[in-house]
Amino acid sequence: METPKSCLTRFDRIPTRKGTRPSTICGPLHIQCSGSGDTKYVRGLITEVLTWPHVESTPPVVSSPDLISIHLKQAQGATPSSAATAVKEFAKVYLEAPAIYLTLPLVTAHWAILHGWAEPHYLASHGLMPAGTVLPYTPREESELEVCHFHFSRAYEFARESVEKKQPTTLSSPANASIFAFQERSGS
């Protein structure tokens, strides 16, 4: 698998964010109110993320420049009910707010929060979004962009791993063999 480029490779090696945490408005639309940098950093990051394997945005960035939902592509010819090919959103970005939502592995989310790079999403705190969904603070400079890039790459890897683990059992798999044996014995 092609992995996104980043010098940061481990969540426990992320530096502590400098300065105070930005102020945010907590609610269903959880947004950052202060401390955001130039949107060029986020726009550049989004452009790169959309080049990663099996990634797309809904709606396409050109039709909705303010709201970008980033997810894994649904496999060609897949049925919507198939767990293995379900669309897996791992990021949502509101460019004008500004706000980034990422669904991270719990350990990564923990370290992002602990080191001052994010806060738990309001709806995740109430069980209405997946655990590990955070509001990472938008990057103010190049060094912060690298940390934000790391968090996007972890969200991407987590989404890919989640989809791979949820593959449904097929009719020829050993898990279903007992069903067929029962049907044969009962005459069904």
Predicted stretch roles:
Residues 1-188:
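Charge-dense, helix-prone N-terminal extensions
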